[in-house]
Amino acid sequence: MVKCGASCVLGSDLGTSATKSIVLDSRGHIRGWARQEYETSRPRPGWAEQHPHDWFNAFCNTARLAIRQAAVNPEEIHAVCISGITHNAVLLDENDDVIRAAILYTDVRSQTQSDALLHEWGAEILNRTCNLLSPVWTWPQLRWIKENEPKVWRRVHHVLFPKDYVRHQITPSFLTDTIDPVGTCLYDPHRNQWIDMFCADLELSPGAWPKPTEPWSVVGTISKQTAKHIGLPPNTPVVAGTTDTAAEVFGTGALRPGQTTIKLATVGRLSTVIE
């Protein structure tokens, strides 16, 4: 094992098809990296689901391999941060166990629910959330579960998002950042708060929704069990993290109004800074 001569961080991204982890030093050099794919279940046409356990396993495996490849003193890795795919809700019961597979943003089963919500709320959704509702957003997906899987829905105690679920496994906290909730169409990005009248449609306890914090906030330290498994000290700080797209836009340097990032992945995206 050698010293890299600079502070390092461990970053992981939970993608649609795979999780990628890297060890990055303060000069921007990648010291180690790893990638692990997972399956998407498609039980019916237009449906797409993944199990959150697969994300956590992929994080642990790729983090361990990236740290090993980096060949640095684990004490030199000063923080862990996770980004991830959006619009996907992880449903937990009162024991923090996953209730069902997560419906992906590529799933369109909730067209009926999306149409009904647009009929009920109209332009109010766009005005409050700055987004046009469709089946790929979390609100209609959750309403589909509420209407079609009532036994499942009655067990829901907490709602998290992919990167928040994995982070919760390594440092328990029911938190999210201020960007991930925007993908639900249940969140006001101007006030950085959940929209009570929209959330009330799903009839969940107000405590079910994760508390938003800034993406760069330190939210805890890695648990002893996870630290031992991936090869880090148990006191390593864990940062809140954010969505994959937000991290990509920032990473490409698109910071001023008019600058644009084009993303080519499972789903292409064009992101332009407006203010």
Q: What is the predicted function of each stretch?
A:
Residues 34-40, 114, 170, 202, ...:
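Short, small-residue-rich loop/turn micro-motifs
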Residues 119-123:
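Conserved FAD-binding subdomain of flavin-dependent enzymes
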Residues 89-114, 155-156, 160-195, 236-275:
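Glycine-rich phosphate-binding loop of actin/hexokinase-like ATP-binding domains
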Residues 14-16, 125-245:
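Gly/Ser/Thr-rich active-site cleft segment
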Residues 47, 55-56, 105, 137, ...:
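Signature tryptophan residues that serve as conserved aromatic anchors
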Residues 1-101, 127, 155, 227-228, ...:
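N-terminal glycine/serine-rich phosphate-binding loop of ATP-dependent small-molecule kinases
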Residues 56-60, 64, 111, 115, ...:
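Generic alpha-helical structural signal
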